[in-house]
């Protein structure tokens, strides 16, 4: 059966002479290799291959094979990366001692002639794999057209289809036929066509089979139409690994654009850049793994490889590979620059690669990059040191040699004279190695050819060994709001605050990060955060954003004077303009609505849904709704305290702690550097909180746990369920503990605030405390009241106020205290949402979309060893992993909290608060844990979620630990 007949390129596309020269070289090489494969049984040839160990190129003369005599110039400009060992020799032999017709690996460096300067160069050996997993060592031809290669899985097993330059014959012509064809060409026949062969021809047959030439057919199976316009990058399948072959200027590590476009086809694909041929005494190893980003040469080579969008989609539909379940890294909605734009920005992109020189393993790989198949590369103090890392295939097949340069100098990341220079700036001597390895901009990373698809297990292995990939949202918001009428604007108070933790957020500081929120009834009117505040490692505020971009640029071009204290490590934003005008719906806890929050940039879009927000229409309804909603304040709740003065004008002052910025910086840095980081247990200790106290702020607030001292004194003798349902009342002694920093207040007495007066005579608990109540906090020891000292930069202090007496003649019997506005506080219950995801390399060069971010509120293990996960935002196909072990999800159900919930829940906070403080629309996942996870020797494993092609960290670990 003959291959697909296609029209051969015209003279307008390809110069005839170069086309014939390239075709002649292809067929000569294919014929020679076919002869070698067929005659491996020859003792003479076998001994020759064993003696040379394939360390020298092999020149073929007719039916004989001899080592090539390479000139010194050829040795200095090219190399061979052989793959041949005793193991492969034994694998290539049958049981009777004879050789296979097609061994797994045969790589030969073949001399080719340079058409411009007549110098002799060598092609780098490589292999290609067809759909039947047969290894073929013939090289592709390359022309000056901007086309790329795609295997045709729908044709014959040995047939390939190609979208342009990389064209391979479906069968190998004989040497005599090639000589006949050369004679025809030399005679000057204008009607000479490329000989093709309609019959199937196996390379293992070598010269023994002579198919009849068919001059009327074009011998290349090519189902897609050639198009020159560069639209989207080509996407080679994992079975083909093109070589790194560019003719480069020896005076520079970066090839010029002229050297790429003006080089002949043979030079373009046959010559390599600065590799050395190993000596015979050197122990042969599999080709070493280069940096995950590849070489600058590869970038220059493949930025010309483009195909049209229709052809790309059609080709992808014909490829049946394990990567089909992964989304393609390039979406039609993502704009791509033209070739001229990429050519123009190349010099800047290459300059921005310098920040990777400390650890090339930190360079972001892509969807099918082999970075997932190896352990993280260790840091090296020698710039030109090679990294001993070997790739493995997903399907358990043979290892394909990687022919990319393996040293930092060959990759163009170091200047040639940097061998004797100190590779670390003085300011980074005591810092973690990845401090200078964070990319400044995702769009500055050049595209590379993807090598292999990845599995979830390999992605988990990568993210758990590269903790810098972890990023997080931490959102704090009130549990209810007041309805606005007409033109009235009752803004949400306290406003929604969003913390951006993890340094990967800061790779796109200049990409105009947008944070917005809207209610479910008003989706078309989102409210945006006006400013995003950034903080450095010491918790100091960095502003404005132009300074952020400047410090990011300094990090990528660091020197002795670089100020790393100006580099941000986390950010936060306040959404102060959110108000609600609807009616809400009754969900059993009162009337409520739902919020949606989104975070988007040029490369990301994340969405948080179903954030419940209680609604009250009038303050007079607050007391009536106490028994049927979450209006009341209970023992263990998270609350926010703010001063009521000008609270409805977005100028409220919020109670916080003096070291909150420094504590959040520590958490964000731990997410980057500490692989054992678990936010449920990673809380500041007493030493870190030494000297910290309560403070006020208007651009940041933090939730506080509120505890009854009487309930805490009961200790283990009380029922935790009863304690969590304990409603707080006035005149009770409480303490406040910051949820973020752990700073604790002194014992305080709750006092109801009425008409600027506070009663001093009542001592017994009386009226229950509910949200938006007016309160005063009296120190239990000094009997003074908590207030804001405006003279001391809004610091927290204590005052006695003006005392009122029932008997003016007896000053010891004061009944009331008249307090200033700075001592009047409002309290409201709050809720927090934490979702952590891994910013993987697979998302670096694609538009990363997560329509629903999951977050886990609490978990528990029942008496039947079934694992329960409670939270929101779960997809129907969510997967639960305990490190590398997958748990089977038995059911996904809506959960309605009640008082019968067992007390053995593990909350996302250090204190197990009541269920009523959680969101009302919880989802319950019931999972079955594998038996192996109950063994006493099981290692500490993070509990991960996988949905929307994204890995999420739940914040919990297995085995479960109550805290």
UniProtKB/Swiss-Prot annotation:
Listed Polar residues bias regions: 143-207, 249-289
Classification via SUPFAM superfamilies: DNA-binding protein LAG-1 (CSL), p53-like transcription factors
Induction: Expression increases as the cells enter the stationary phase, with a statistically significant peak at the late stationary phase. A similar increase in the mRNA levels is found in the sporulating cells.
GO cellular component: chromatin; nucleus
Region described as Disordered: spans on this chain: 130-207, 248-289
Entry keywords, A to Z: Cell adhesion, DNA-binding, Nucleus, Transcription, Transcription regulation
Pfam family, one: LAG1-DNAbind
UniProt family annotation: Belongs to the Su(H) family.
Descriptive protein name: Transcription factor cbf12
Gene: cbf12
């Amino acid at each position: 059966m003959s291959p697909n007949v296609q029209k051969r390129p015209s003279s307008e596309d390809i110069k005839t002479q170069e086309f014939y020269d390239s075709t002649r070289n292809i067929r000569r090489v294919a014929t020679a290799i076919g002869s070698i494969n067929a005659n491996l049984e020859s003792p003479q040839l076998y001994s020759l291959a064993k003696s040379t160990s394939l360390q020298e190129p092999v020149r073929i003369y007719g039916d004989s094979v001899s080592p090539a005599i390479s000139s010194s110039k050829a040795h200095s400009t090219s190399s061979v990366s052989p793959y041949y060992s005793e193991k492969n020799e034994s694998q290539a032999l049958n049981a009777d001692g004879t050789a296979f017709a097609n061994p797994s690996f045969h790589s030969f460096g073949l001399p080719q002639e340079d058409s411009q300067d007549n110098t002799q160069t060598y092609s780098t050996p490589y292999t290609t794999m067809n759909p039947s997993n047969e290894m073929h060592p013939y090289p592709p031809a390359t022309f000056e057209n901007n086309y790329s290669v795609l295997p045709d899985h729908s044709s014959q097993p040995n047939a390939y289809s190609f979208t342009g330059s990389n064209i391979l014959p479906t069968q190998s012509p004989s040497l005599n036929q090639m000589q006949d064809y050369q004679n025809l060409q030399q005679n000057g026949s204008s009607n000479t066509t490329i000989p093709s062969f309609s019959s199937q021809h196996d390379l293992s047959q070598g010269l023994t089979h002579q198919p009849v030439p068919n001059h009327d057919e074009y011998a290349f199976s090519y189902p897609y139409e050639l198009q020159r316009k560069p639209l989207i990058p080509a996407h080679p399948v994992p079975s083909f690994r093109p070589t790194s072959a560019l003719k480069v200027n020896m005076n520079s590590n970066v090839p010029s654009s002229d050297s790429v476009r003006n080089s002949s086809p043979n030079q373009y694909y046959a010559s390599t850049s600065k590799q050395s041929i190993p000596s015979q005494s050197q122990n042969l190893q599999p080709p070493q793994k280069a940096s995950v980003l590849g070489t600058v040469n590869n970038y220059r080579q493949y930025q010309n490889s483009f195909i049209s969008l229709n052809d790309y989609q059609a080709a992808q539909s014909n490829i049946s590979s394990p990567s089909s379940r992964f989304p393609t890294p390039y979406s039609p909605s993502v704009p791509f620059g033209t070739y001229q734009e990429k050519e123009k920005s190349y010099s800047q992109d290459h300059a921005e690669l310098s920040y990777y020189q400390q650890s090339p393993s930190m360079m972001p790989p892509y969807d099918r990059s082999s970075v997932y198949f190896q352990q993280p590369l260790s840091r090296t103090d020698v710039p030109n040191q090679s990294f001993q890392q070997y790739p493995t295939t997903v399907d358990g097949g043979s290892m394909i040699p990687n022919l990319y340069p393996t040293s930092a100098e060959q990759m163009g990341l170091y200047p040639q004279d940097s061998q004797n220079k100190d590779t670390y700036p003085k300011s980074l001597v005591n810092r973690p190695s990845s401090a200078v390895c964070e990319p400044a901009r995702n769009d500055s990373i050049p595209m590379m050819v993807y090598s292999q698809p990845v599995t979830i297990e390999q992605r988990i292995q990568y993210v758990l060994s590269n903790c810098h990939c972890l990023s997080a949202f931490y959102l704090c918001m009130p549990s209810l709001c007041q309805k606005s009428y007409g033109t009235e604007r009752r803004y949400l108070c306290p406003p929604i605050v969003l913390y951006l933790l993890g340094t990967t957020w800061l790779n796109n500081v200049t990409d105009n990060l947008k944070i917005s929120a809207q209610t479910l009834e008003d989706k078309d009117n989102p409210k945006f955060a006006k400013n995003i505040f950034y903080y450095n490692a010491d918790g100091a505020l960095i502003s404005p954003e132009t300074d952020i971009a400047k410090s990011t640029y300094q990090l990528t071009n660091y020197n002795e004077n670089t100020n790393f204290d100006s580099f941000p490590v986390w950010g936060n934003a306040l959404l102060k303009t959110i108000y609600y005008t609807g009616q809400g719906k009754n969900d059993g806890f009162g009337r409520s609505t739902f919020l949606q929050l989104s975070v988007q940039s040029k490369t990301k879009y994340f969405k948080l849904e179903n954030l419940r927000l209680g609604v009250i229409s009038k303050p007079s309804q607050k007391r009536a709704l106490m028994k049927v909603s979450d209006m009341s304040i209970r023992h263990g709740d998270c609350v926010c305290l703010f001063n009521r003065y000008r609270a409805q004008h977005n100028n409220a002052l919020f109670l916080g702690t003096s070291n909150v910025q420094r504590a959040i910086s520590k958490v964000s840095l731990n997410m980057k550097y500490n692989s054992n980081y678990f936010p449920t247990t990673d809380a500041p200790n007493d030493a870190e909180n030494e000297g910290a106290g309560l403070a006020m702020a208007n651009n940041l607030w933090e939730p506080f746990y509120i505890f009854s001292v009487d309930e805490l004194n009961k200790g283990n003798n009380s029922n935790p369920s009863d304690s969590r349902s304990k409603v707080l009342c006035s005149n009770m002694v409480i303490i406040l503990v910051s949820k973020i920093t752990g700073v604790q207040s002194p014992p305080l007495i709750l006092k109801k605030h009425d008409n600027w007066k506070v009663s001093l005579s009542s001592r017994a608990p009386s009226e229950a405390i509910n949200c938006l109540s007016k309160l005063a906090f009296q120190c239990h020891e000094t009997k003074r009241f908590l207030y804001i000292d405006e003279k001391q930069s809004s610091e927290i202090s204590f005052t006695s106020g003006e005392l009122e007496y029932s008997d003016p003649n007896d000053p010891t019997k004061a009944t009331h205290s008249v307090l200033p506005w700075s001592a009047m506080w409002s309290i409201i219950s709050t809720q927090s949402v934490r979702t952590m995801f891994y910013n993987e390399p697979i998302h670096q060069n694609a538009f990363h979309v997560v329509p629903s971010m999951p977050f886990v509120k609490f978990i528990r293990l029942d008496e039947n060893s079934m694992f329960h996960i409670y939270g929101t935002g779960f997809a129907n196909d969510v997967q639960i992993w305990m490190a590398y072990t997958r748990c089977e999800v038995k059911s996904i159900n809506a959960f309605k909290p009640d008082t019968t919930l067992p007390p053995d829940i593990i909350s996302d906070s250090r204190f197990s608060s009541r269920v009523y403080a959680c969101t009302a629309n919880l989802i319950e996942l019931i999972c079955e844990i594998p038996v192996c996870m109950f063994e006493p020797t099981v290692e500490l494993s993070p509990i991960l979620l996988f949905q929307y092609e994204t890995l999420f960290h739940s914040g919990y670990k297995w085995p479960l630990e109550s805290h």
